[in-house]
Amino acid sequence: MKFIRPVTLILLIAVVSGCTAIPPVDFTVQDVGMVSNRKDAEIKSLTVGFAPQEQQSIVEANATIPPLWKEALQDALNRSLIFQDDASIKVNLSVRIVEFDAPSFGVEMTTTVGAIYEVVNRKNGDLLFAELVESAGVVPPDYAFVGAVRAVESWNRAVRNNIAAFINQLEDADFSKPMYRGENE
């Protein structure tokens, strides 16, 4: 009888754990609204990738992360209406991921991410915006019993927070004062 209780408890935990589905990797920011300070610029190109090794701190991510980040960023930019169609200034937006520190285990799962966002004027090469945006995604232990579920959700939250922080910083940026003047004046 004493043997049956622990075995039953272990089986119950295994069944409950097995029923939990790992959420998809989804970086889409849900609460993006139209910004009040729109830029007189049209985005022509958007790229997202990993920074060169010498710029990276901790990157524990595979090649599936940049395309998902790009898709979520494009969605957030579209919904924020921060860039204008048919504007006189055409720009490229480049994102280089310098940190993706995902938790391997733990009770409270925290993922930290960092990315360098650069907006460049296509006509003259002026660097209109360049910032390292850092963020974290924290998932408490009561979110889910299975650690893998909390870990993936912490990735999602970290990148969502990063994209939202970028849009907030970009809204405050002044494109009339380039950070760096390009060569083609």
Regions found by a protein language model. Give the residues of each.
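Residues that form or immediately flank small-molecule/cofactor binding pockets and catalytic motifs
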Residues: 8, 53, 138
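Compositionally biased, intrinsically disordered linkers/stalks adjacent to structured regions
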Residues: 143-185
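Surface-exposed short loop/turn segments
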Residues: 20-28, 80-130, 137-153
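A structural "domain/chain start" motif
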Residues: 18-71, 171-185
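Extended alpha-helical regions
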Residues: 1-2, 97, 110-113, 177-185
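Extracytoplasmic/secreted envelope proteins and their assembly/folding machinery
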Residues: 66, 70, 74-78, 114, ...
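Sec-dependent bacterial lipoprotein signal peptides
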Residues: 1-19
